[in-house]
Amino acid sequence: AVQATFFWSPLGVVLNGVVIGLITALIALGMLLIYRAGRVLNFAQGELGFIPAVLAVMLIVESELPWAIGLVVGLTASLLLGGAAEFLVIRRFFRAPRLVLTVATLGLAQVLGFLALMMPRWWDSRVASQRIDVPLDAVWDVGPIRLGADHLLVLIAAPLLLAGVGALLRWTGLGVAIRATAERPDRAASLGIPVRSIQTVVWAVAGALAFMALFLRAGVLGLPVGGRLGFGLLLRALAALMIGRLNHLPTVLASSVALGILHQGVNWNQDSPLVGDAVIALVIVLALLVRRSRSDRGELELGVFQAVGEIRRLPVELAGLIQLRLLRWGAVAAIGAFLLWMPHWLGTENLLRFSYLHLVVMVVVSLVVLTGWAGQLSLGQWAFVAIGAVVGAKLTQELGADLLLATLGAGMAGAVASLAVGLPALRLRGMYLAVTSLAFVVAVTTYLLNPRFFDWLPQGRVQRNPLLGRIDWSSSFAMYHVSLVALLVTFVAVTGIRNSRTGRVLIALRENEVAAQAFSINPTRAKLTAFAISGFFASCAGALIVHHQQALVIDDAIRTSIGLFVAG
């Protein structure tokens, strides 16, 4: 409805959107299978298909082997790679909290993406959007769009693959075993079902689906530039899963196709493809907000994304020993002296790097409050950094505010924005917040706060005006100390919050929300507090980062957000 109303496009564009949507559906189906079998959202789903897809394309393009041989070799490699990934990596986290396993899939995606980039070197080549053509000669024009045999292959092969997997799950013994493992893994194991072997098979099938998606995409659009799955495709696949509540296969597949049509319609009506990702992100947020909240066994149960746990504190008897207290304060003093002495032997370039590192650690600390304490999974922390950067630069450059006031103002703006993003978390469970926050960072950094679209955003050089009207901090040496002081203040503030009632309440909610409510704790208020605190510190860091960089830089914000999540 959104596409037809606001982004009308001719039939050829709609058909092209169906093609892209079917490719997205293959990715989403693989993610759904893995989630149903192991209750983990696999962020490495696209990368599972890259290595075999690159192998198949290189065999066809560089070695000049027939198209069918490349397909068979790639499909075989994808089955082996999917099974190996589960056996060598995922199985090691079988008993770990799902949050840890989610981080493991993010790390697996990085490794597989790197290997996909390295593989073409065997042919003295590189991943450069190579295309492969189906050995059929068919071209027809549908309005202004020219479709070929590669599009026809997707329209035929993708529905057959989707129907085949659906039949496998519904009418075969393997499908029954997969569904039993997904519903009650412990009971399935007690009935003699090899749960871990079933998961290996599921990962192998998911790897094959990922390969077919990338192989078909190579015929239509070519291999992804840089050897990595585009975040737009990943976001659409995640959105389809969330709309289908990680459970209803027809809804997931229909949503994938609908989002593909919408994306192509937006691109047809707009000059920049970045607008398409922003519109998709907005539609995702609205779709998740209007869904009615209800309990579903397909969703993540309470506490499934609980962190590993905190390091136990020393017993009171040991902590009170004078030797340990002296050791603790001595270690703090030694670290402080080292940090203060370090800039004297660092060059300008390294000083700026360490200054930036201090500010990034501030963002990581803000994420610890939200995910580590409150148990809310967020992938969009860098969006609040961007908001803080814009507000901080506007306050100092246009209104002449002091850096301290600008940083506090940016923090308040980030807290308000974080509350707005956190509202879905009060109605929706599990991974919905992760997808909402990922959609939010895509919308903010690709369009809403992109200087290419809005001239009111900071465009030129951001000057470092004197601090408190008299302290010059324009040098890299002074910038280092400003960032260090900001990091120390953040540590002290967050430590105080952790030791206060607010921190204890957040930990209690993360561990057992039902029991915490029995002690008259308001979970809504506590979660919103965590969002506000997290957004405040992230935006404060953003205000300092824009002055450190002396320009508004939001490139690669999505990967940075995911990297911050892994670090946190």
Features from the language model and the residues they span:
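Hydrophobic core segments of alpha-helical transmembrane domains in multi-pass membrane transport
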Residues: 1, 56-57, 75-81, 108-117, ...
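Short, hydrophobic transmembrane alpha-helix segments
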Residues: 2-14, 32-41, 57-69, 268, ...
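Transmembrane alpha-helices and adjacent helix-loop boundaries
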Residues: 8, 46, 99-128, 149, ...
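Hydrophobic alpha-helical segments within and immediately flanking transmembrane helices
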Residues: 23-31, 41-62, 77, 81, ...
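Alpha-helical transmembrane segments of polytopic integral membrane proteins
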Residues: 28-37, 56, 81-87, 108, ...
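Helix-capping/transition residues at the boundaries of transmembrane alpha-helices
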Residues: 35-38, 60, 90, 94, ...
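Membrane-cytosol interface at the C-terminal ends of specific transmembrane alpha-helices
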Residues: 160-182, 199, 203, 215, ...
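Interfacial "coupling" helices/loops that link adjacent transmembrane helices in transporter permeases
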Residues: 173-199, 510-514, 521-525
